[in-house]
């Protein structure tokens, strides 16, 4: 908790690289390693309402969060400033519309169900959405058109500098020492979606004179080293893979690629370049991510003042001085009048025509009703709801 309290930025994920060496976890770690702010990591299953309440002034980044109590999502939306890095399709109960169809025999309709609605609301409430590929963003926005309004960026998979440097060394060694021609690699995935059998079959059908080998059971760097010895990589996932690192690594190493359209970053301009151009693009991604966070921290803070009036001229309140005092430091001042008949409303209207930061509204009430005290609170609530600033400053009209 000490790390949490001292942090400016909070990373929330189901697992981190110490727990599992998957592509998502490597991207998360690559971003964490170059954090320009004090940043802590929290497992999604450990997040609770108390932490959210203590972290309202922090900036939160949500990665994979299936393990998080989804009942916390409305609390997060209402109280936190946050961004989401979307690695897959969390609105689907299978996190893959293709797996959904494979398992049920029906097209995915999760976007119409409660899960889809709560996940889309979580995305829509964020300061920024980071996608893995343009195709992924299109699939989301087709099902949830309101997400088009969100600030969003295609981030792609992110690589650490040491990983890119290691891959570059392997590429240079490969150019000098050579590689096994007519020999294709297939990466042994731990998920049906990786399409190992289909990848092997594609090599046999496309290059019948070539051999194919399935690589697995190796550490990350050993796998890259072994991969560099092959002529090409075959990767035919059975469903949409948002931005698979494997094909990026193979391309950086200089291998030929035999891939299908389920590789969803296929066709993006950066991925069509040579190894140096792809590396140049990847080197920019951490900065693109952290610039969004920096823009949040360095944003101008807007402040709205608000108050209420009712026959304040007749009451001889210092109402003009009260409003003027807020205009001295607020970006806008909202005044809700309760139905004045002593000239107050006319004075407010005339003043607002000369002062564009003064926003005046009238909500008439029956002040002779026995609920007049409740009406007073409701007037303040109306005024507050009309404020557009990030922060609000309330004053009674007899205060200066």
Predicted feature residues:
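Acceptor-binding helix/loop patch of EC 2.4 sugar-transfer enzymes
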Residues: 85-117, 270
């Amino acid at each position: 908790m000490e790390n949490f309290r001292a942090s400016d930025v909070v990373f929330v994920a189901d697992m981190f690289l110490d727990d599992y060496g998957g592509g998502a976890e490597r991207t998360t770690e690559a971003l964490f390693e170059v954090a320009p702010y004090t940043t802590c990591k929290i497992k999604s299953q450990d997040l609770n309402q108390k932490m959210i309440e203590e972290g309202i002034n922090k900036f939160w980044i949500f990665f994979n969060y299936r393990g998080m109590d989804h009942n916390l999502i409305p609390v997060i939306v209402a109280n936190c400033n946050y961004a989401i890095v979307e690695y897959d399709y969390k609105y689907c109960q299978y996190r893959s519309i293709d797996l959904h169809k494979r398992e049920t025999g029906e097209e995915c309709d999760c976007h119409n169900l409660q899960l889809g609605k709560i996940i889309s609301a979580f995305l829509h409430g964020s300061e920024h959405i980071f996608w893995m590929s343009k195709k992924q963003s299109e699939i989301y926005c087709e099902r949830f058109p309101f997400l088009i309004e969100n600030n969003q960026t295609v981030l792609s998979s992110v690589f650490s500098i040491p990983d890119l440097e290691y891959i570059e060394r392997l590429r240079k060694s490969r150019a000098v020492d050579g590689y096994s021609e007519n020999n294709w690699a297939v990466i042994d995935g731990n998920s049906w979606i990786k399409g190992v059998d289909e990848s092997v079959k594609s090599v046999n059908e496309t290059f019948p004179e070539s051999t194919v080998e399935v690589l697995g059971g190796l550490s990350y760097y050993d796998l890259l080293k072994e991969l560099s010895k092959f002529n090409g990589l075959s990767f035919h996932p059975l469903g949409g893979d948002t931005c698979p690192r494997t094909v990026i690594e193979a391309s950086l190493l200089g291998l030929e690629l035999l891939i299908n359209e389920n590789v969803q970053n296929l066709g993006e301009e950066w991925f069509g370049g040579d190894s140096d151009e792809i590396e140049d693009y990847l080197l920019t991604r951490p900065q693109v991510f952290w610039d969004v966070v920096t823009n949040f921290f360095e944003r101008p803070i807007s402040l709205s003042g608000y108050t209420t009036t009712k026959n304040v001229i007749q009451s001889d309140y210092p109402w003009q001085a009260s409003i003027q005092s807020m205009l001295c430091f607020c970006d806008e001042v909202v005044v809700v009048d309760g139905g004045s008949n002593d000239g107050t409303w006319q004075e407010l209207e005339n003043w607002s025509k000369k002062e564009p930061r003064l926003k005046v509204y009238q909500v008439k009430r029956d002040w002779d009703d026995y609920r007049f005290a409740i009406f007073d609170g409701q007037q303040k609530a109306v005024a507050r709801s009309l404020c557009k600033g990030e922060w609000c400053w309330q004053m009674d009209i007899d205060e200066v």
